[in-house]
Regions:
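The alpha-helix within a helix-turn-helix
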Residues: 63
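C-terminal regulatory/oligomerization modules of transcriptional regulators
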Residues: 1-7, 130-151
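N-terminal leader segment of winged-helix/HTH proteins
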Residues: 1-37
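Charged, amphipathic alpha-helical coiled-coil/dimerization segments
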Residues: 60, 78-138, 145
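Short alpha-helical "packing" element that flanks the helix-turn-helix/winged-helix DNA-binding module
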Residues: 46-47
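Short capping segments at the starts of secondary-structure elements
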Residues: 53-58
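Helix-turn-helix DNA-binding motif, specifically the short coil turn and the N-cap/start of the second
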Residues: 69
Length: 151
């Protein structure tokens, strides 16, 4: 590159270049922490997101939150339902839509997973100040807003 880069541009390059790597690192750490629970990595996020929603989340909304295509999510939900962790119900306001709920076993597992993730977050991010945490979240929010504008 012939163009001289100032410090701000270099830092922005490091930030954008590090996003994918950091996501992979986090996934590896979470997989390591949650691996003993007998649930696949792929099933963990849908299960957690259903729990965090309070239940009754539409399948389409969950797919959007996870950035997944419907058919890929359906396969994971089939596994979670077969494991008696999630149940599907028809949405009374739109029979074409499914609502997703945790079963009793699903609630118990999600609580254990969330407890483990709270500890992991403290281990990884505990040295960050509140201002630093807010700065990271602001960067992610700006990225999401730019993606919404562009795509």
């Amino acid at each position: 590159m012939d163009r001289p880069l100032d410090e701000r541009t270099v830092l922005q390059m490091q930030l954008s270049s590090g996003l994918l790597y950091a996501g992979r690192q986090w996934q590896r750490l979470a997989d390591s922490r949650l691996g003993s629970y007998g649930i696949s990595t792929a099933c963990t996020m849908p299960l957690l997101m259903i729990g965090r929603s309070g239940g009754g989340i539409r399948q389409v909304a969950l797919a959007q939150q996870l950035g997944m295509e419907g058919p890929s999510l359906v396969r994971l939900l089939d596994k979670l339902c077969a494991s008696d962790l999630v149940r599907r119900e028809s949405d009374a306001s739109d029979r074409r839509a499914n609502l997703l709920w945790l079963t009793e076993a699903g609630h118990a597992l999600v609580q254990e997973l969330e407890d483990q993730l709270i500890d992991l977050r403290q281990d990884v991010f505990g040295a960050l100040s509140m201002d630093e945490l807010h700065a990271v979240l602001k960067a992610w929010r700006l990225l999401a807003e730019a993606a919404d504008r562009i795509t």
